[in-house]
């Protein structure tokens, strides 16, 4: 009579305990960079440790763990935690005069990750214009994702519109509210020129609004996205400066048409989802 069910066989040890390893294993030594003590550190990505509210941060984390302990183990929302995206939308509306939906916001672990998503969304056949001088890491990340970048010169109003029009770029990445490294603020006239350029075909502006929270006096400069009537601006920002680089929270706001395209193309993705 044939028996049904599950049967377990004993697994014998395939390797003798006394067996010597005869294969030569190469030893790899990792050369760690030496720690240098600088006289003056001009690194622009540092925070003041004595200014960070560690006690408050720790108290909030403990309370959230107690209040929402089960939710920390659940599958996160697509495009980032919903509460975070809602808070970002509120912040943009109140602080930057930019009215967007939380559903337009994508949260990622750093701007580099979001740059890669933009490349996949707009295509590797895109040509991205960047500012010269500018933050060279931006073009390095784009190029590492297989996209050609061109570095366009600056004039007294920002990136040269004449050079942009002569180029074959279909995307321009700019920091109009606080250019790196000069600190220039792009005037309204140049912003409207760039928007007119973007309106001519399948072109987009990536507005990198880093450092927008910091100013000595007055109100913050309005974003280009807030005056964009044709959904041509992809707005980006990060909390690396306002909180800490280790937080690794960046976000971008996609125009509705691109958000629809993104949702269809990347429905399998779950971006930054750690609730803490």
Regions found by a protein language model. Name each.
Residues 52-56, 217-218, 246-248:
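Short aromatic-enriched loop/helix-cap "lid" or pocket-rim segments at secondary-structure transitions
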Residues 1-62, 257-258, 263-275:
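N-terminal basic, amphipathic alpha-helical segments
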Residues 39-41, 149-151, 233-235:
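Conserved beta-strand scaffold positions in the cores of enzyme catalytic domains, especially
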Residues 31-33, 97, 225-226, 241:
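Short secondary-structure boundary/capping segments
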Residues 233-276:
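PLP-dependent aminotransferase class I/II
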Residues 64-66, 71-202, 206, 212-214, ...:
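Conserved core of the PLP fold type I
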Residues 9, 43, 153, 225, ...:
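Residue-level detector of conserved, well-ordered beta-strand and adjacent loop positions
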Residues 8-10, 226, 250-256:
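Short beta-strand-to-turn element immediately C-terminal to the catalytic PLP-Schiff-base lysine
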């Amino acid at each position: 009579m044939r028996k049904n069910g599950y049967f377990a066989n004993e697994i014998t040890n395939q390797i003798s305990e006394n067996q010597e390893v005869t294969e030569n294993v190469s030893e790899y030594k990792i050369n760690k960079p030496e720690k240098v003590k600088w006289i003056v550190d001009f690194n622009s990505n540092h925070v003041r440790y004595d200014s960070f509210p560690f006690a408050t941060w720790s108290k909030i984390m403990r309370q959230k763990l107690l209040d929402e302990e089960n939710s920390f183990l659940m599958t996160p929302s697509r495009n980032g935690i919903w509460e975070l995206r809602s808070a970002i939308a509120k912040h943009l509306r109140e602080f930057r005069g930019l009215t967007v939906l939380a559903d337009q916001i994508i949260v990622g672990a750093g701007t580099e990750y979001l740059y890669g998503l933009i490349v996949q969304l707009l295509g590797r056949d895109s040509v991205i214009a960047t500012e010269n001088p500018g933050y060279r890491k931006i073009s390095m990340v784009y190029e590492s994702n297989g996209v050609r970048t061109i570095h366009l010169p600056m004039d007294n109003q920002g990136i040269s519109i004449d050079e942009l029009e002569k180029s074959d770029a279909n995307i321009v990445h700019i920091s109009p509210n606080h250019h790196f490294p000069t600190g220039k603020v792009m005037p309204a006239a140049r912003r409207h020129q760039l928007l007119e350029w973007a309106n001519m075909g399948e072109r987009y502006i990536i507005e990198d609004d880093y450092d927008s929270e910091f100013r000595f006096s007055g109100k913050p400069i309005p974003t280009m996205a807030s005056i964009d009537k044709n959904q041509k601006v992809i707005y980006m920002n990060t909390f690396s400066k306002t909180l800490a680089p280790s937080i690794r929270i960046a976000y971008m706001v996609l125009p509705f048409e691109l958000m629809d395209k993104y949702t269809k193309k990347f429905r399998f993705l779950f971006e930054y989802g750690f609730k803490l």
